[in-house]
């Protein structure tokens, strides 16, 4: 069982856990859900991850990591835009990194979606509002 942050963020409440307890009580198996969510990936999405990781850069002090996914990368790997969702977590998992940023080209226009994640010391919601 999980929520979007795997129960690790401050907005995870006791209500969240009560809902999960109810799901377990009706027969949902946590191991099976975990496997389906975290241990299942398509080859296309895995190839996209490899492409994206090759774009990663760090600030000199190693506290900020950023990477990007282009429309060409999506086309080359035949991955879906949904396949980009967990990529930012690889940047955030690097030791010393406090802020991770993912730039994603979306759709047929020239828009770029920017996602921020932090380990908690920095309120990235303020950055996202800029």
Language-model segment annotations:
Residues 1:
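Catalytic-core segments of class I nucleotidyltransferases/pyrophosphorylases
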Residues 4-130:
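Hydrophobic helix-and-loop "lid/oligomerization" segment in the mid-to-C-terminal part
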């Amino acid at each position: 069982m999980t929520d979007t942050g795997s129960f690790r963020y401050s907005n995870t409440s006791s209500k969240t856990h009560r809902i999960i307890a109810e799901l377990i009580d009706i027969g949902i198996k946590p191991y099976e859900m975990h496997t389906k969510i975290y241990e299942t990936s398509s080859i296309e999405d895995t190839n996209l991850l490899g492409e994206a990781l090759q774009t990663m850069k760090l600030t000199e002090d190693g506290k900020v990591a950023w990477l990007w996914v282009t429309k060409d990368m999506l086309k080359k790997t035949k991955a879906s835009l949904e396949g980009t969702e967990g990529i930012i977590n690889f940047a955030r998992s690097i030791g010393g990194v406090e802020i991770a940023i993912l730039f994603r080209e979306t759709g047929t226009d020239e828009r770029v979606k920017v996602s921020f994640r932090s380990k908690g010391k920095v309120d990235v919601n303020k950055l996202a509002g800029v």
